[in-house]
């Protein structure tokens, strides 16, 4: 059996992606001016790579499923029963919304529950696309700004108290309850979050216009997300 194989990955055309970097990298002509956000190489069920073998082109996920020990080795096949990582190349043109990754235990439970409910894997209300918890390692090929985690309790509480439109959230953070604060905000009706976020975005826009913000300030990124104007309603909670 050959030791190395050529792989052809799959492009993901998410709205936030750029239109030139990945097509140029992969030698693809973007005739339809689509956003090329991600290039996946792996055996994910929704975008498995094509592998070139002596017997022709094959689906990588199908090969692994049919004979995991042959393609992954006995140890990896026994421990993970599948390829345990997904390699991605990203071209992030627009600001991404918030992401929350579950623990491995919750991922397994959540995936099985949504399978039982019959929620389509590509449905908008589908939370668990697979049983993985998705720890990530990122290598930046250019400057990349990332907001990761939460502020320390004292600083976050001070921040909430410093802005009148954020004060309604203070009570939800009693005892440094990050989980309660996050769950409360994300489950608020859209109209309620619009009332909180609109003044934040208006303040950010004024500060940017005055030149008083830098990329180290979260307000700068809030403004960048809606750089073309603040929507009248349905402001993104993330």
Where are the language model's segments positioned?
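Acidic, glycine-rich loop-and-beta core segments that form the ion-binding/anion-interacting portion
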Residues: 208-238
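Transition-metal
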Residues: 1-216
């Amino acid at each position: 059996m050959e030791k190395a194989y050529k792989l052809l990955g799959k492009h993901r055309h998410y709205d936030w992606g750029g239109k030139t970097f990945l097509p140029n990298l992969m030698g693809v002509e973007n005739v339809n001016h689509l956003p090329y956000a991600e290039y996946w190489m792996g055996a994910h069920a929704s975008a498995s790579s094509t592998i070139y073998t002596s017997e022709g082109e094959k689906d990588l996920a199908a090969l692994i499923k049919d004979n995991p020990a042959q393609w992954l080795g006995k140890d990896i096949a026994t421990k993970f029963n599948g390829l345990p990582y997904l390699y991605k190349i990203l071209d992030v043109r627009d600001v991404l919304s918030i992401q929350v990754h579950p623990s491995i235990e919750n991922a397994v439970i959540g995936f099985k529950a949504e399978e039982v409910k019959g929620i389509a894997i590509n449905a908008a209300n589908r939370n668990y696309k697979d049983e993985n918890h998705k720890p990530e390692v990122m290598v930046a090929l250019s400057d990349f700004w990332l907001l990761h985690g939460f502020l320390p309790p004292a600083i976050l509480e001070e921040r909430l108290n410093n802005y009148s439109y954020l004060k309604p959230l203070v009570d939800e953070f009693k005892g440094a309850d990050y989980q309660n604060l996050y769950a409360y905000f994300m489950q608020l009706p859209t109209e309620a979050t619009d009332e909180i976020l609109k003044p934040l975005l208006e303040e950010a826009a004024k500060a940017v216009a005055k030149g008083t913000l830098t990329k180290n300030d979260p307000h700068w990124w809030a403004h960048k997300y809606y750089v073309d104007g603040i929507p009248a309603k349905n402001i993104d909670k993330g």
